[in-house]
Amino acid sequence: MNIKRNKPNILITGTPGTGKTSLAGVIASNNEMNHIDISSAVKEKELHDGWDSEFQCYILDEDKVCDEFEDVMVKGGNVVDHHGCEWFPERWFDLVIVLRTDIKILNDRLEKRNYNQHKITNNLDCEIMQVILDEARNSYKQEIVVELPSTTLEDNENNQNFISQWIQNWYEKNN
């Protein structure tokens, strides 16, 4: 289902530590869009079902999140970041970016966050098995899912340029 809006919605997803929040913030700021950090919103707006002590994070309530952001997403102009992607309504997004990071670099990033070893191992396994990429490919039209490397500063700059160009092309095509 295509929804006509004046600005696109973009999902930036990937394993924790791939740079989603940083990239989403820059893209939103540079393109006069809203940045929606789902993990922060879950905590701040209590869109969860409690705390998972094993993974040391809140248990996201997908229905609460969708209810909270439905009206905002319909309007467009949002850059959403979250490590999961398969549960969002497909109609919300015009572009789905899946960030991928070299395993050694990802491990270092997760250790710097003081993740416990179980959580680090789980996230590294997800990256190795390309779980998020497969979820995106299985949940959204193939033509809107783009896999981008996110290991180096050069990758980050290239990703910013790619997404900004995509946004410009979207405006030309849709307005």
From Swiss-Prot:
It holds the Pfam family AAA_18. Its EC number is 2.7.4.3. The keyword Glycosyltransferase does not apply. ATP binds at residues 17, 19-22, 113. Residues 112-122 are annotated as: LID. Keywords: ATP-binding, Cytoplasm, Kinase, Nucleotide-binding, Nucleus, Ribosome biogenesis, rRNA processing, Transferase. It is an enzyme of class 2 (transferase). GO terms for biological process: maturation of SSU-rRNA; response to oxidative stress. Residues 37-60 are annotated as: NMPbind. One of its GO terms (cellular component) is cytoplasm. GO terms for molecular function: adenylate kinase activity; ATP binding; ATP hydrolysis activity. It catalyses: AMP + ATP = 2 ADP; ATP + H2O = ADP + phosphate + H(+). It is found in: Cytoplasm; Nucleus. Belongs to the adenylate kinase family. AK6 subfamily. Monomer and homodimer. Interacts with small ribosomal subunit protein uS11. Not a structural component of 43S pre-ribosomes, but transiently interacts with them by binding to uS11. Broad-specificity nucleoside monophosphate (NMP) kinase that catalyzes the reversible transfer of the terminal phosphate group between nucleoside triphosphates and monophosphates. Also has ATPase activity. Involved in the late cytoplasmic maturation steps of the 40S ribosomal particles, specifically 18S rRNA maturation. While NMP activity is not required for ribosome maturation, ATPase activity is. Associates transiently with small ribosomal subunit protein uS11. ATP hydrolysis breaks the interaction with uS11. This is Adenylate kinase isoenzyme 6 homolog. It comes from Dictyostelium discoideum (Social amoeba).
